[in-house]
UniProtKB/Swiss-Prot annotation:
Protein's recorded name: Type IV pilus inner membrane component PilN
UniProt function note: Inner membrane component of the type IV (T4S) secretion system that plays a role in surface and host cell adhesion, colonization, biofilm maturation, virulence, and twitching, a form of surface-associated motility. PilN/PilO heterodimers form the foundation of the inner-membrane PilM/PilN/PilO/PilP complex which plays an essential role in the assembly of a functional T4 pilus. In turn, associates with PilM and facilitates PilM functionally relevant structural changes.
Localization (cell): Cell inner membrane
Entry membrane topology: Single-pass type II membrane protein
Example of a GO biological process term: type IV pilus-dependent motility
Keyword set includes Cell membrane: yes
Cellular component aspect of the GO annotation: plasma membrane; type IV pilus
Origin species: Pseudomonas aeruginosa (strain ATCC 15692 / DSM 22644 / CIP 104116 / JCM 14847 / LMG 12228 / 1C / PRS 101 / PAO1)
Top-level taxon in the UniProt lineage: Bacteria
Transmembrane listed as a keyword: yes
Consequences of knocking out this gene: Deletion mutants lack surface pili.
Gene responsible for this protein: pilN
Membrane-crossing segments per the record: 19-39
Amino acid sequence: MARINLLPWREELREQRKQQFLVILGGVLVASAALVFLGDQYFTAAIENQNARNDFLRKEIVVLDARIKEISELKSRRQQLLERMKIIQDLQGNRPIIGRVFDQLVRTLPDGVYFTDLKMTGKNIAIAGAAESNNRVSNLMRNMDASEWLTAPTLNEVKAVTQGAVDQANVFQLTVQQTQPGEEDAKAKHGVAQGAKK
């Protein structure tokens, strides 16, 4: 005779499927939690790594800013030294010229004229002095105009001043340009050459 199984197999099957579903659901939850944890760990490590890089870059930027400032100070100091060297070289180069100019001032000085003040700014020489007469001042200006080292004397002022009961002097102020022999010829030749090129 055939055997009939009267056990509630459908309920057992349902119960078995329910257990499988719960096991799968638990596995998915555990896997999701593990995935979230690993993702959090990864992003935390990435953020910490980036923060470490940023800190390193900030420190390097501070070091580079200090070096840039130091380089800027060195450039400024170098420029000051170059300017000082140029001034010293100009003074050394002009030393014989200044001696010649003073020699020419003495040579152009006629009798009865003396200088009370002399100021040289660049190539301009401002002279103050006194003379016995206006003719002596005129002689001084003619002598300066004839000099190779002096040019363009300009009389600014002449005043008659009484010194004591009898003496009278003419106080004057004039300006003159310092030049070098051959300098005007060189400028004229350069101007002619420039005109020929045009």
